[in-house]
From Swiss-Prot:
<comment type="pathway">
    <text>Cofactor biosynthesis; adenosylcobalamin biosynthesis; cob(II)yrinate a,c-diamide from sirohydrochlorin (anaerobic route): step 6/10.</text>
</comment>
<comment type="similarity">
    <text>Belongs to the CbiD family.</text>
</comment>
<dbReference type="GO" id="GO:0032259">
    <property type="term" value="P:methylation"/>
</dbReference>
<protein>
    <recommendedName>
        <fullName>Cobalt-precorrin-5B C(1)-methyltransferase</fullName>
        <ecNumber>2.1.1.195</ecNumber>
    </recommendedName>
</protein>
<dbReference type="GO" id="GO:0043780">
    <property type="term" value="F:cobalt-precorrin-5B C1-methyltransferase activity"/>
</dbReference>
<dbReference type="GO" id="GO:0019251">
    <property type="term" value="P:anaerobic cobalamin biosynthetic process"/>
</dbReference>
<keyword id="KW-0949">S-adenosyl-L-methionine</keyword>
<dbReference type="Pfam" id="PF01888">
    <property type="entry name" value="CbiD"/>
</dbReference>
<keyword id="KW-0808">Transferase</keyword>
<keyword id="KW-0489">Methyltransferase</keyword>
<keyword id="KW-0169">Cobalamin biosynthesis</keyword>
<dbReference type="InterPro" id="IPR036074">
    <property type="entry name" value="CbiD_sf"/>
</dbReference>
<dbReference type="InterPro" id="IPR002748">
    <property type="entry name" value="CbiD"/>
</dbReference>
């Protein structure tokens, strides 16, 4: 049983969108609401408190605090400030102090640009559009961003001198908490009650949406808890389990990590390098993969057919790892997709 109801949080993208909307309201209406409501990419609307307002010459600024709910997060309590000024036309979003700079390829932001994810950027624009269609320039800054970034993995993925503004849904799920297993178990039981024998497990939002379109309503989002979720599924009597994932998390499973949270380890690049050797890629590409900061960067060095060959090897290794914890009478399948929804590999019984 859950000891408490679990609290969801908001992403840095949602926090920035709220501060941007509040600052624009202050700029155009001279109002300082205690909270603002913002749209999200998944259709939900979030009401988010605003901490403070401030005039800086011609700029109108608002501060919002990031809330991470019950998900352990070094960014919990982070202050994000947006400062707005009028301009002739259009909406211009720029990263200020405390927002990191992208230094390596493979991310969704170009090298040299401020680390504001495209989906988060669109969330900010959508929030502003609810206030005005006039021209406005918004600068987003994080007062302690550079210091706090040292506690994150930003440098490892090629973002320096600040944090990233991220988020695909605006909502931060408590996926790393032990009690989240109760949520997973409950959802597995719901699928069981539908009379399904095949269960689809998806770690994140993108893989979950892909799996729902492909398999229907027998999909459960599992976060980092791959091994535990498979164990729970078997306990509930499922005889066919398919794991659908983006390359990053599934590569961790291929390395033997059944909990993909960063605190348990990370051998993604090493695993991909090994797969590249098995795929007999040329030494130059193997070296590029071995020196990549992220899986996404490594993928950029591969031709389409090379990607499929490489991730077919990864998927087969995942099946080998899973088979060690699953009896032979349970069917297993693995589907690896890109962030754009391209199928990179399909192995096992699907």
């Amino acid at each position: 049983m859950l000891s408490t109801l679990k609290r969801f949080g908001i992403t840095t993208g949602a926090t920035a969108a709220a501060s941007a909307k509040a600052s624009v309201i202050y700029l155009f209406r001279n109002e300082t609401p205690k909270s603002v409501t913002i749209p999200t990419p998944i259709g939900l609307r979030l009401e988010i408190p605003v901490d403070d307002y401030e005039r800086r010459g011609e700029e109108y600024c608002a501060t919002v605090t990031k809330f991470s709910g019950d998900n352990p997060d070094v960014l919990n309590g982070l202050k994000i400030v947006s400062c707005s000024t009028k301009c002739d036309s259009g909406i211009f979003i720029e990263g200020g102090n405390g927002i990191g700079v992208v230094t390596k390829p493979g991310l969704k932001v170009e090298v040299g640009e401020k680390a504001i994810n495209p989906i988060a950027r669109q969330m900010i624009i959508d929030a502003i559009n609810e206030v005005t269609t006039d021209g406005v320039k918004v600068r987003i800054e994080v007062p302690d961003g550079e210091k706090i970034a040292e506690l994150t993995m930003n440098k490892d993925v090629g973002v320096i001198n600040g944090i990233s503004i991220l988020g695909t849904t605006g909502i931060e799920y408590p996926i790393s908490d032990d009690e989240y297993l109760e949520h997973i178990k409950s959802e597995i039981c719901v699928v069981k009650a539908l009379g399904k024998k095949k269960l689809i497990l998806a770690p994140g939002n993108t893989s979950f949406e892909f799996a729902r379109k492909r398999y229907g309503d027998n999909v459960v989002k599992i976060g980092d808890r791959v091994g535990d979720s498979i164990r729970l599924a078997i306990e509930q009597g499922f005889t066919h389990i398919v794991l659908v994932s983006l390359p990053g998390k599934i590569t961790k499973v291929a390395s033997g990590l059944m909990n993909t949270h960063s605190k348990y380890g990370d051998a993604r690049i090493e695993t991909l390098t090994h797969a590249a050797v098995l795929a007999k890629l040329d030494i130059e590409k193997i070296n590029k993969i071995a020196n990549s900061a992220t899986v996404t960067e490594a993928i950029t060095y591969l031709l389409p057919e090379e990607r499929k060959t490489l991730f077919s090897i990864v998927a087969k290794r995942v099946l080998q790892r899973l088979r060690k914890i699953v009896k032979n009478d349970v069917k297993l399948g693995v589907v690896i997709i890109s962030e754009e929804g391209e199928v990179l590999a399909e192995e096992g019984e699907l």
